């Protein structure tokens, strides 16, 4: 049934496919983020309560969303690698980790910048903020654990187990504003009822959310190719590729 997938399981085939897809996602990222951020910063109306300080939302909200999305994707890849013994899934997980760490860092920094005029302080030990900070440390822990072993396979398995066992942090982050009395506002665009954000503000936000998604995919494709080269450095296909680049 799955025989048609076998040719695509070869590292050299995956390397080539990722190379072909990368320019597409780079272009989509440029268009979506270019339009979304310019629209949000320059043309979206000021908020009636927050004034222009709300505009940092166009970076903060997408990076916060995908900081969780990347970790969830890593956990899925880790399960695939451990259950079905697919080595490339571990490579994909490791390829995503620095991107997720970057998104989490950006969400924390932009959140602090946004929080200063709104809350009067750069940081509070709010449930959502604290959980997001823990997520950042989990990303760093996965990268550190992977690098701690001389055997890349053992390091990848250890990092995968850590990712799977800590993925529970994601519902804690998402539902923290409902479970605890927090300063952080609730969802603005994921509600079943009418979104609590004006359409002229909402459209560029959606563009930025999809823009950061394509950025995540693009960077993952680039990093996954690098991981494939490192993993198969002594394989004939990598040596042949090196010869063509000389």
From Swiss-Prot:
InterPro entries attached here?
Cyt_c_assembly (IPR002541), Cyt_c_biogenesis_CcmC (IPR003557), Cyt_c_biogenesis_CcsA/CcmC (IPR045062)
Q: Which residues form the signal peptide?
A: none
MF (Gene Ontology): heme binding; heme transmembrane transporter activity
Where would you find this protein in the cell?
Cell inner membrane
Q: Does the keyword Mitochondrion apply?
A: no
Q: How does it sit in the membrane?
A: Multi-pass membrane protein
Spell out the Pfam families in the cross-references.
Cytochrom_C_asm
Mind telling me which GO cellular component terms the entry cites? plasma membrane
Q: What is its main location?
A: membrane
Q: Where are the transmembrane segments?
A: 24-44, 64-84, 94-114, 129-149, 160-180, 197-217
Q: Which UniProt keywords apply?
A: Cell inner membrane, Cell membrane, Cytochrome c-type biogenesis, Membrane, Transmembrane, Transmembrane helix, Transport
One GO process term, biological-process aspect: cytochrome complex assembly
Q: Would I find Transport among this entry's keywords?
A: yes
Q: What does this protein do?
A: Required for the export of heme to the periplasm for the biogenesis of c-type cytochromes.
Per the record, the similarity remark reads: Belongs to the CcmC/CycZ/HelC family.
Protein's UniProt name:
Heme exporter protein C
């Amino acid at each position: 049934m799955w025989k048609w997938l076998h040719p695509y399981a070869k590292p050299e085939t995956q390397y080539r496919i990722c190379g072909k897809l990368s320019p597409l996602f780079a272009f989509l990222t440029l268009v979506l983020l270019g339009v979304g951020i310019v629209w949000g910063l320059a043309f979206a109306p000021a908020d009636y309560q927050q004034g222009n300080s709300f505009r940092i939302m166009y970076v903060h909200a997408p990076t916060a969303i995908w900081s969780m999305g990347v970790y969830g994707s890593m956990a899925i890849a880790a399960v695939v690698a451990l259950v079905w013994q697919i080595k490339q899934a571990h490579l994909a997980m490791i390829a995503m980790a620095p991107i997720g760490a970057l998104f989490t860092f950006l969400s924390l920094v932009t959140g602090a910048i946004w929080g200063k005029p709104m809350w009067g302080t750069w940081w509070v030990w709010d449930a959502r903020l604290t959980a997001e900070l823990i997520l950042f440390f989990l990303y760093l822990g996965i990268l550190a654990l992977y690098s701690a072993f001389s055997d890349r396979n053992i390091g990848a398995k250890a990092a995968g187990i850590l990712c799977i066992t800590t993925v529970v942090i994601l519902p804690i982050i998402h539902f923290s504003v409902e479970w605890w009395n927090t300063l952080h506002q609730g969802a603005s665009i994921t509600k079943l009822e009418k979104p609590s954000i004006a359409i002229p503000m909402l459209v560029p936000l959606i563009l930025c959310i999809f823009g950061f998604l394509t950025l995540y995919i693009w960077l993952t494709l680039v990093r996954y190719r690098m991981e494939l080269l490192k993993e198969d450095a002594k394989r004939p296909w990598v040596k042949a590729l090196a010869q063509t680049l000389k």
